[in-house]
């Protein structure tokens, strides 16, 4: 065998393996490199012996086996057959200069006109370029120069790089002596005269219509992919096979009968002017509307129930009917047809099936099956031997027929149905229960009723089981009274009752027009439900905007969200201002904010006080709003705010103001000593008090982080809390206290008894502490008294803020400046503070503040003997907590 590592019997360079064979020690001779490998069948000299060329296993260059072995692609020179050309350094430098000048490099070999956009591409090409050796393959010459190329792509690159500004010369048409194969579509701008027939092997795309003046004979079937308009009738001599449905837009006259072997779908109504003879059964899957009376010459067997929406006039007299027991498979009509019946069908069947006028009805107002007229949906067996009866005559054999059809002789049934009868479930009897109005007073039951209605509509083709049908057969024979049957009262034509009755006849149930959810199977049951439903709808309707809701919870939420300031008529009539406040408080708790009810005002408030303040001013002109006024004592001008008044006094009247009247409140301070904002405006007192409280909270949070609580003593010592006294609690009637305690037990809260005070507390002790400082009552409220000066305040925050601003140096005391030895101060200073003073006055955290010796002596606190009697015990009592609010006072 030939060595797989050699080509054409030659040893490849770099291979040292010997080929397999019978003689494993065979030697091989390396041949010189030849440009042309040995041809197939040529003898090869190997090892001094002439070996015939092996055609099947000799890898000829160009064959697939040779390509796989060498790993080279077609069209490239083989590395084994060609030595790579060396490139001198000077030539490389020339290429670099040329590339810098023109951005491309041209092959320097004569006869080669290729250009490359990179030096690496030219280097690879130059090592393998054969120059003019391939001149016989240069079939694409350049029309502007002497260059020639082997492919059209190379010619296009050359033209774009060198002759871009010169237009292409027009090609001259030459005579075609041989057939030309056209592989791509050719655009033809002028008509081409064809003298001989042209054979077309492939389909030719025609974009414009071609006028044909002579008939064209077609030897093969021509597939038509697009619709071709036909203006003249095309005579068809042979049958044409139609594989796809052909839409017919115009009427086509048919002179001969057309045999239809397959079903033809009819999507539009087809007018039939002549009678069509039907020899086979036609299955009708959809209901066919019949607008004209159809004459039926033969009886039509109906296997399924037929819904009849209008009364059918019967021209012939029907013989007396018999009682028929309906099995489950036969009773496919709606349930109302099998169990209930209206008055209209009972009246229609009076002359055919005589029934007594007075019969007992079920509890829910439904008519029993004995009063039911036989519907045309069932095929009843009739006695053919009985003669026809006139409408006015009473059938003589009616009683005997009814007696014969009693429960003693039931009709024959299918034994297979009787075998499986016990497996069927008996449907529950309709009780006619109405939804209750108690509880949440909502329509929550309507959801279940709606689900039941959906299930009933899907199962309304199923009737009651055979047990129900057996129960509804009268146990005793019916006796027909001799009196004429009482005429049935029909509702007025076109009235709602007639529509409901018609709906019961057609669908087996009628929908309540009030709620459009609940359905009833009898007119009496529907009326009974409508009475309750109307009350339910009225109770669940918003009294302000008349919107309807399904539950009481939804109505309450809507009222709170949209009409929070508008109480309902019932609530407005029952309660007064207190009830209205409670209602608004509940709305605020549930909704989070209160909206202004005025039209065009979208203000919302998160507090009851802000809402009531806005209500007193919303929609009123400024003159009607009773705002406070601050008159100037110098010029008489009035201002709406104290800040505006103070600014006017400081800017216009620099002289000191006259003495203030004696009746001025003691808590009012000098306007010149108030704090200002960085912009120069007077800072509001409420804002200053709020900042003070925030500082206290921050100090507490800072002290809570330390492992030892001593830092809090350094920040705010206990002596600072004893520089003012709280007012004493008022003496109250024990009976009044007991009444308040009972009110807290019942309601959970108690209101302030003073007029125009809206304070509310959850404990009697909190209310008592509030009454000590409430200024809206008839009694004189107690004051918070500063122990460092004779000023009094109505709130604890006011006296704290006063001490912070006026007596700031008294908040921090050091051993360098011990407090005066006063009996009141000795009793007020705790033991802990005394130990600190004796220890040498070392304090952690803050540098002691030195007091000037010029401090006035008037800053000393007054003697305990000068305090009011009610404040002695208060001042002597030390406060250990951070802050004791008014609601935390102990109850006496």
Curated annotation (Swiss-Prot):
GO MF, any single term: zinc ion binding
Region (Disordered): 1-82, 323-473, 562-582, 649-682, 812-892
Biased composition (Basic residues): 418-428, 832-849
Zinc finger feature spans (C2H2-type): 105-129, 140-163, 540-563, 594-618, 630-653, 750-774, 784-807
Low complexity composition-biased segments: 8-19, 385-398
Main location: nucleus
Annotated GO CC locations: nucleoplasm
Biased composition (Polar residues): 371-384
Ranges of biased composition (kind: Basic and acidic residues): 819-831, 850-876
BP GO terms, sorted: negative regulation of miRNA transcription
PROSITE patterns associated with the record: ZINC_FINGER_C2H2_1 (PS00028), ZINC_FINGER_C2H2_2 (PS50157)
Oligomeric and partner information: Interacts (via its NuRD interaction motif) with RBBP4 of the nucleosome remodeling and deacetylase (NuRD) complex; the interaction is direct and may play a role in repressing gene expression.
Protein name from the UniProt record: Zinc finger protein 512B
Taxonomic source organism: Homo sapiens
Gene: ZNF512B
């Amino acid at each position: 065998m030939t060595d797989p590592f050699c080509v054409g019997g030659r040893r490849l360079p770099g291979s040292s393996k010997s080929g397999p064979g019978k003689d494993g020690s065979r030697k091989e001779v390396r041949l010189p490199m030849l440009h042309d490998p040995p041809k197939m069948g040529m003898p090869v000299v190997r090892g001094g012996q002439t070996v015939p060329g092996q055609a099947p296993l000799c890898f000829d260059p160009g064959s697939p086996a040779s390509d796989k072995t060498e790993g080279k692609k077609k069209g490239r020179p083989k590395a084994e057959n060609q030595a790579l050309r060396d490139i001198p350094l000077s030539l490389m430098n020339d290429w670099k200069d040329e590339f810098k000048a023109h951005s491309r490099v041209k092959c320097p070999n004569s006869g080669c006109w290729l250009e490359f956009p990179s030096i690496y591409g030219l280097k690879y090409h130059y090592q393998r370029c054969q120059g003019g050796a391939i001149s016989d393959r240069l079939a694409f010459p350049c029309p502007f120069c002497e260059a020639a190329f082997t492919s059209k792509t190379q010619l296009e690159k050359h033209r774009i790089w060198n002759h871009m500004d010169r237009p292409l010369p027009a090609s001259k048409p030459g005579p075609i002596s041989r057939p030309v194969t056209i592989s791509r579509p050719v655009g033809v701008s002028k008509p081409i005269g064809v003298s001989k027939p042209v054979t077309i092997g492939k389909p030719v795309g025609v974009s414009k219509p071609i006028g044909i003046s002579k008939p064209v004979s077609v030897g093969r079937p021509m597939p038509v992919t697009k619709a071709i308009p036909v203006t003249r009738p095309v005579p068809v001599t042979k049958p044409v096979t139609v594989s796809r449905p052909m839409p017919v837009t115009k009427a086509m006259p048919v002179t001969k009968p057309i045999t239809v072997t397959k079903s033809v779908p009819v999507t539009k109504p087809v007018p039939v002017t002549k009678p069509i003879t039907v020899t086979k059964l036609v299955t009708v899957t959809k209901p066919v509307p019949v607008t004209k009376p159809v004459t039926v010459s033969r009886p039509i067997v109906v296997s399924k129930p037929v819904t009849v929406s209008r009364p059918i006039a019967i021209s012939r007299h029907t013989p007396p009917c018999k009682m028929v027991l309906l099995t489950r498979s036969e009773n496919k009509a709606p349930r109302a047809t099998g169990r209930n019946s209206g008055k209209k069908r009972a009246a229609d069947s009076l002359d055919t099936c005589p029934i007594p006028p007075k019969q007992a009805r079920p509890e829910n107002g439904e008519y029993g099956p004995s009063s039911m007229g036989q519907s045309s949906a069932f095929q009843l067996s009739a006695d053919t031997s009985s003669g026809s009866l006139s409408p006015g005559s009473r059938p003589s054999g009616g009683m005997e027929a009814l007696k014969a059809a009693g429960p003693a002789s039931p009709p024959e049934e299918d034994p297979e149905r009787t075998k499986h009868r016990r497996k069927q479930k008996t449907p529950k009897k309709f009780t006619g229960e109405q939804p209750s109005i108690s509880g949440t007073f909502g329509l929550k039951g309507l959801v279940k009723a709606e689900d039941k209605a959906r299930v009933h509509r899907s199962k309304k083709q199923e009737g009651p089981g055979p047990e129900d049908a057996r129960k509804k057969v009268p146990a005793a024979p019916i006796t027909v009274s001799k009196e004429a049957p009482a005429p049935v009262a029909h509702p007025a034509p076109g009235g709602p009752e007639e529509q409901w009755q018609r709906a019961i006849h057609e669908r087996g149930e009628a929908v309540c027009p009030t709620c459009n959810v609940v359905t009833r199977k009898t007119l009496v049951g529907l009326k009974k439900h409508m009475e309750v439903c109307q009350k339910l709808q009225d109770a669940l309707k918003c009294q302000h905007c008349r919107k309807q809701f399904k539950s009481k919870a939804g109505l309450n939420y809507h009222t709170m969200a949209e009409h929070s300031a508008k109480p309902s008529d019932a609530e407005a009539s029952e309660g007064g201002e207190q009830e209205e406040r409670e209602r608004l408080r509940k709305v605020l708790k549930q909704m989070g904010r209160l909206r202004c009810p005025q039209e065009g005002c979208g203000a919302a408030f998160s507090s009851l006080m802000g809402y009531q303040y806005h209500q007193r001013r919303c929609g009123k002109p400024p003159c009607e709003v009773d705002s406070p006024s601050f008159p100037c004592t110098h010029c008489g001008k009035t201002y709406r705010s104290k800040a505006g008044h103070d600014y006017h006094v400081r800017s216009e009247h620099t002289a000191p103001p006259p003495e203030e009247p004696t009746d001025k409140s003691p808590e009012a301070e000098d306007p010149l000593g108030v704090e200002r904002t960085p912009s120069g405006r007077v800072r509001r007192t409420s804002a200053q008090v709020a900042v003070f409280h925030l500082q206290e909270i921050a100090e507490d949070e800072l002290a809570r982080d330390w492992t030892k609580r001593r830092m809090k003593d350094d920040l705010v010592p206990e002596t600072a809390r004893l520089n003012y006294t709280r007012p004493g609690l008022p003496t109250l009637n024990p009976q009044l206290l007991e009444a308040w305690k009972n009110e807290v037990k019942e309601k959970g809260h108690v209101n302030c008894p003073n007029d125009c005070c809206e304070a509310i507390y959850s404990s009697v002790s909190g209310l008592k502490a509030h009454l000590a400082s409430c200024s809206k009552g008839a009694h004189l409220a107690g004051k918070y008294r500063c122990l460092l000066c004779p000023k009094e305040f109505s709130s604890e925050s006011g006296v704290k803020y006063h001490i912070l601003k006026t007596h700031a140096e008294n908040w921090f005391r050091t051993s360098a400046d011990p407090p005066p030895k006063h009996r009141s101060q000795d009793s007020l200073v705790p033991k802990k503070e005394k130990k600190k003073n004796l220890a040498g006055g070392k304090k952690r955290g803050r540098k002691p503040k030195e007091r000037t010796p010029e401090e006035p002596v008037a800053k000393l606190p007054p003697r305990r003997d000068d305090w009011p009697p009610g404040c002695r015990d208060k001042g002597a009592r030390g406060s250990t907590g951070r802050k004791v609010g008014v609601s935390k006072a102990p109850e006496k």
